[in-house]
């Protein structure tokens, strides 16, 4: 089927549908101001995607 687009590069509305409910939309905007604990969690999540 040709090359697949990497899901994590998509921003905006498409991110939620590509990554599953809650993954795209919530985490895109959570990056603005994270607590240290959230930042730790965010790094782990990004590696897994």
Curated annotation (Swiss-Prot):
Q: Which UniProt keywords apply?
A: Sporulation
Organism's domain of life? Bacteria
Quote the HAMAP family the UniProt record gives.
SspO
Subcellular location(s) of the protein = Spore core
Protein name per UniProt: Small, acid-soluble spore protein O
UniProt-listed GO biological process terms: asexual sporulation; sporulation resulting in formation of a cellular spore
Q: Name one Pfam family in it.
A: SspO
The Swiss-Prot or TrEMBL record describes its family as follows:
Belongs to the SspO family.
Organism name: Bacillus anthracis
Induction info reads:
Expressed only in the forespore compartment of sporulating cells.
Q: Tell me, in one coarse class, where this protein mainly resides.
A: other
* Compositionally biased residues, Polar residues: 8-20
């Amino acid at each position: 089927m040709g090359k697949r687009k990497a899901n994590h590069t998509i921003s905006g509305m498409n991110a939620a549908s590509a990554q599953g409910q809650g993954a795209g939309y919530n985490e895109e905007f959570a990056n603005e101001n994270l607590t240290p604990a959230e930042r730790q969690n965010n790094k782990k999540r990004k590696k897994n995607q």
